[in-house]
Design a protein with these regions (language model features):
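An acidic, gly/pro-interrupted, aromatic-rich
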Residues: 1-8, 16, 23, 30, ...
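Alpha-helical secondary-structure segments
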Residues: 28-38
Length: 179
């Protein structure tokens, strides 16, 4: 991420451990991911307990936060199976791959696109807004993705799955877990 001397790691021991895992397994990314994903810290619940409900710095529980604008738009494209189109970029380009933060996108503007002026996200707010909620409910672009003939949603609703199976499948595709 940002390895400048002016931005020291918050947990240098952890960074050293992960570097050791990476080098000892010949830079096997899957092994590194296994190490991280199987860790106690990664698997912590987002539900705070009485003893850690005010803790927002010690990683005592997962802190729920809104996805960045680019990740949210890419997730909507992934779930619906309908790619976003950006002028001057091939179809299927993901929002996270855009280097030009001036490309017109009402979605990215509404959800607080990264200005890409600094590796720090300290200038952007993760708090949801009414405009964001209304955009998710009423945006014609999202409606077109959902209703597209080739969308995953259309294929699922035209399938022989029961309502319960549809809910399960959509939950797995969007959340990666059962409802």
């Amino acid at each position: 991420d940002d390895f400048r001397e002016t931005n020291p790691p918050t947990n240098p021991e952890l960074l050293d451990h992960l570097a050791s895992v990476l080098t000892s397994h010949q830079f096997d990314i899957k092994q590194l991911m296994r190490e991280i994903l199987n860790s106690h810290t990664f698997q912590l619940s987002s539900k705070p307990t009485d003893s850690n409900k005010t803790d927002d710095q010690s990683y005592s529980h997962y802190l729920v936060r809104r996805l960045p604008a680019e990740v949210m738009l890419d997730a909507i494209c992934q779930v619906t199976g309908v790619a976003e189109e950006y002028a001057g970029h091939p179809r299927g380009t993901r929002a996270i791959e855009l280097w030009d933060n001036q490309l017109p996108s009402y979605f990215l503007d509404t959800f607080g696109r990264s200005l890409r002026e600094s590796p720090c996200e300290c200038g952007s707010s993760g708090d949801p807004t009414m405009a964001q909620a209304l955009h998710l409910l009423n945006a014609p672009e999202i409606e077109l993705k959902i209703q597209a003939i080739n969308s995953n949603i259309t294929q699922l609703t035209n399938s022989t799955l029961t309502n319960e199976q549809l809910i399960d499948e959509i939950s797995f595709r969007t959340l990666g877990r059962p409802p």
